[in-house]
């Protein structure tokens, strides 16, 4: 398709046909082809085509800004690498009243050759819509060099405490990788009792590509698990609140009491 575009006469094409081609190029993030097409469309006198050209310009500008942002995140990680594999690790589920705490560790190929090697939209998982997270989670799992997910359930949280469990999931997700990284960077917390060099980054999921990737796959994994739990325990709205203490959730606790996946050590103010 890309080679054919350079042979097309856009002046003889209908607006619909041009738009279909442009939409296809946007979908696959083919910036080079879009720039080529737009150079032609800018000279077209049709109003609809001129409007399309303006939309292409805006798309290209947004993508160029996104490329700069992503390269900054990748380059942030490279500062720690020093020719060794770097793992980013993050947890999700520290604060909910129910369900597990989950961490993911991810090793990315930070040596991008061009913008197509970057993960468009990669950022702190909390700033993404659910569908965006799911799409990125699939891409990260497919293209990451290595990744691993580890969880501890509510019973372990009640027995050992959330602070210990938080450290344990960060540690075990890292140690469960198929290779041992030269350094692991973590979001907000240093990892105790791990025999790998560790740097913790405040707001790391906004600064580091590797930590952001870990935060996304950890959150998608946990959210999916809570959706499955909602089918077993339907009263609490787990499919919407992921176990966090929303009004709906706390009212259900008062009405129905806790279910087997609730963290009893978290419920003193609710039951």
UniProtKB/Swiss-Prot annotation:
Highest taxon of source: Bacteria
Keyword hit for Oxidoreductase: no
Chief location bin: cytoplasm
GO CC terms of this entry: cytoplasm; ribonuclease H2 complex
Residue ranges constituting the RNase H type-2 domain according to the UniProt record: 84-271
Keywords linked to the UniProt accession: Cytoplasm, Endonuclease, Hydrolase, Manganese, Metal-binding, Nuclease
Protein name: Ribonuclease HII
Organism annotation: Clostridium tetani (strain Massachusetts / E88)
């Amino acid at each position: 398709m890309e080679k054919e575009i350079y042979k097309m006469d856009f002046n003889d094409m209908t607006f619909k046909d041009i738009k279909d081609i442009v939409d296809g190029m946007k979908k696959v993030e083919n910036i080079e082809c879009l720039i080529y097409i737009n150079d032609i469309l800018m000279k077209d006198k049709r109003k609809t085509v001129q409007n399309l050209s303006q939309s292409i310009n805006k798309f290209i500008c947004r993508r160029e800004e996104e490329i700069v942002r992503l390269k900054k995140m990748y380059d942030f990680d490279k500062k720690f690498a020093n020719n060794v594999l770097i793992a980013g690790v993050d947890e999700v589920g520290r604060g909910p009243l129910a369900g597990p705490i989950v961490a993911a560790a991810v090793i990315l190929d930070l040596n991008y050759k061009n913008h197509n090697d970057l993960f468009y939209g990669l950022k702190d998982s909390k700033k993404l819509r659910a569908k965006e997270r799911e799409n990125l989670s699939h891409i990260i799992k497919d293209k990451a060099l290595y990744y691993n997910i580890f969880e501890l359930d509510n019973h372990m949280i009640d027995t050992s405490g959330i602070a210990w469990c938080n450290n344990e999931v960060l540690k075990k997700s890292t140690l469960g990788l198929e290779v041992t990284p030269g350094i692991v960077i973590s979001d907000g917390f240093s990892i105790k009792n791990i025999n790998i060099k560790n740097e913790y980054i405040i707001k790391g999921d906004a600064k580091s590509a590797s930590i952001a990737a870990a935060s996304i796959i950890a959150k998608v994994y946990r959210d999916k698990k809570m959706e499955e739990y909602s089918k077993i325990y339907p009263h609490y709205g787990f499919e919407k609140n992921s176990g966090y203490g929303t009004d709906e959730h706390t009212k259900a606790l008062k009405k129905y009491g806790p279910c087997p996946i609730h963290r009893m050590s978290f419920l003193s103010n609710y039951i």
